[in-house]
From Swiss-Prot:
Pathway(s): Protein biosynthesis; polypeptide chain elongation
Keywords from the UniProt entry: Cytoplasm, Elongation factor, Protein biosynthesis
Cell location: Cytoplasm
Protein's recorded name: Elongation factor P
GO cellular component, one term: cytoplasm
Family label: Belongs to the elongation factor P family.
SMART domains: EFP, Elong-fact-P_C
Broad class of the protein's primary localization: cytoplasm
Amino acid sequence: MKISGVDIRPGNILEYEKGIWKVAKTQHTQPGKGGAFMQVEMKNLIDGRKTNVRFRSADTVERVRLDTKDFQFLYAEGDDLVFMDVETYDQITLPSDLLGDAAAFLQDGMTVLLEMYDERPISVQLPEQVEATIVEADAVVKGQTASSSYKPAILDNGVRVMVPPHIESGTRIVVDVYERSYVGKAN
């Protein structure tokens, strides 16, 4: 579907110069002289390159719709991750860098959403929140209980998050995968 250059929004997937790009940021600019334009920061979903492009209002670009499919994470094998299609039980192996930093939050049996373009995996979406166990938490400094201060803690997957002072080692908590932040105690 073709869209105008000024209708581009963050999160859009675009076909531009024979590549598939995900829009990271946009900034609409109306200079004093000349026409308005949209400054767009994009990342190539195939090779990971980043670029900044200026689209005028008269420019059109192809917006791509990605197919999405549920997959279940099975196991990690070196730098590769093995997933299974929950409908057909077919297995697929993907490089861990496709997930970026979020790969640390993968858990056995976790259902993820694979975004595909022409039957080719482009990105993996994890659930927004996951449960994890704290393996190491700093001691509470006396007198800090009145303020809303947080202390650093390390999770069982090696990720460091800030938690409230009352959270101790061994506690199961809920973590926001993309913000890497404490959400609450797990049930």
